[in-house]
Regions:
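All-alpha prenyltransferase/terpene-synthase fold signal
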Residues: 1-172
Length: 172
């Protein structure tokens, strides 16, 4: 809904550059979601896939917002590209920080611990630990998490393992 509304609003500006930006965002978001969904049964734990997904989703949102802001005040294409790059980098940093928050309970954030894992998502801290330590029992548990078959207790055990093995420090 929000993307469709954004596209409508971009069209109302009569600025084809904004329409192209929002249309491209829709394509990127769709590609990111497809990559993420196709990775749910993967037996590997690729950081490259993780970064591809966040670049096409969160970072694309930030990048488009920054570029649209620049273009809406009639900046040059060069300035708009720089704004888009800054937005992309902020989006990547934002997503990694959000993923780190998933390892710590906080009423302030309104995000329960392990929420990403309860949705079958393994993020940068977990990927680092899985690839670095190659612990077969944790790999099996990670596959269970991806398949949405892990209990809350198993997710809590996995979170502790990631924290104890430097996953949060790596992602920071």
């Amino acid at each position: 809904y929000l993307l469709a509304t954004s596209l409508t609003n971009a069209a109302l500006t009569m600025d084809i550059r904004l329409v192209e930006l929002v249309s491209h965002l829709g394509q990127q978001l769709s590609e990111g979601e497809i990559i993420q969904l196709s990775n749910t049964n993967a037996s590997d734990f690729s950081e490259a896939v993780y970064f591809d997904v966040i670049k096409k989703k969160t970072a694309a949102l930030f990048s488009t917002a920054a570029a649209a802001g620049a273009k809406s005040v009639h900046s040059t294409d060069e300035i708009a590209k720089k704004a888009a790059l800054i937005g992309e980098l902020i989006g990547i940093a934002f997503q990694i920080k959000d993923d780190i928050f998933d390892y710590n309970a906080s009423d302030e954030l309104g995000k329960p611990t392990g929420n990403d894992m309860k949705e079958g998502k393994l993020t940068l801290p977990a990927l680092y630990v899985l690839n670095t330590y190659q612990d077969s029992s944790m790999i099996d548990l990670a596959l269970k998490i991806r398949a949405l078959e892990a209990s809350d207790e198993e997710i809590a055990r996995f979170i502790d393992y990631v924290k104890q093995h430097g996953g949060l420090e790596y992602a920071s």
